[in-house]
A protein has these predicted regions:
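Flexible, solvent-exposed coil segments and beta strand-coil junctions
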Residues: 1, 37-47, 59, 133-144
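Membrane-embedded beta-barrel scaffold of Gram-negative outer-membrane proteins
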Residues: 1-44, 83
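Outer-membrane beta-barrel signature, preferentially recognizing the C-terminal barrel domain
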Residues: 1-20, 47-71, 116, 151-157
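Transmembrane beta-strands of outer-membrane beta-barrel proteins
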Residues: 19-21, 76-78, 160, 166, ...
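Transmembrane beta-strands of outer-membrane beta-barrel pores
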Residues: 25-31, 66-68, 82-88, 166-168, ...
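Active-site beta-strand/loop architecture of penicillin-binding DD-peptidases
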Residues: 26-32, 39-50, 144, 150-156
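Outer-membrane beta-barrel proteins
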Residues: 30-36, 47, 73-75, 87-93, ...
Length: 182
């Protein structure tokens, strides 16, 4: 497989180091991605490993740092971080629309053209014309068609950390939030 990547960023400092702001954007293009591609049963084999696709990744990361106190015996700082990483399947082997990456029954993890990478594929809920889930006479959701029902990767991540240092004693706290992804 061949990879081309590009990255651009900025590091800004304000108020003599009291506030820092960092931003990074990167794009990675992978072609001839190595996949296990399914074969027709008539070939006598179930699949073949080959260079069979293109994937691109867009990444955004922002970090805001604040250091309100920085003296000889006492330091206090905070940092906030946001990151978003999106992978997309642009192309697979000729004639292949999606590739199963894991799972023998539904749901499965798959790579499909035009989808985020990877996705969870399985039975969806039946929906009416308004997009609402259809239920049976017992109030249970009715099964729909096979479809993308989730993503493996999160939509974004948020982070917060703080450090307090008094003389040579330091205490730190970290908080992480992941939105999306099953």
């Amino acid at each position: 497989q061949n990879t081309k990547s590009y990255e651009i960023g900025a590091d800004l400092t304000f108020f003599n180091g009291l506030v820092t702001l960092n931003y990074t954007y990167s794009r990675q293009n992978v072609k001839d991605q190595i996949f296990e591609v399914p074969l027709a049963g008539s070939t006598g084999a179930s699949s073949m490993i080959m260079n069979g696709g293109k994937i691109h990744t867009n990444t955004h990361e922002v970090t805001l740092g604040i250091s309100p106190v920085d003296t000889k015996n006492f330091k206090l700082d905070f940092a906030f971080n946001f990151s978003k990483i999106d992978n997309y399947v642009d192309e697979l082997a000729p004639g292949v629309e999606s590739i199963m990456l894991g799972g023998f029954v539904t749901p499965q993890v798959r790579a499909g053209i035009g989808d985020k990478f990877p996705v969870i594929y399985g039975k969806s809920y039946m929906r009416n014309n308004e997009g609402k889930i259809v239920v049976d006479q017992n109030g249970l959701p009715m099964q729909g068609e096979d479809a993308v029902i989730g993503t493996v990767s999160p939509d974004f991540r948020l982070g917060f950390n703080t450090n307090i240092e008094l003389y040579k004693f330091r205490i730190s706290a970290v908080f992480d939030w992941k939105q999306g992804g099953q």
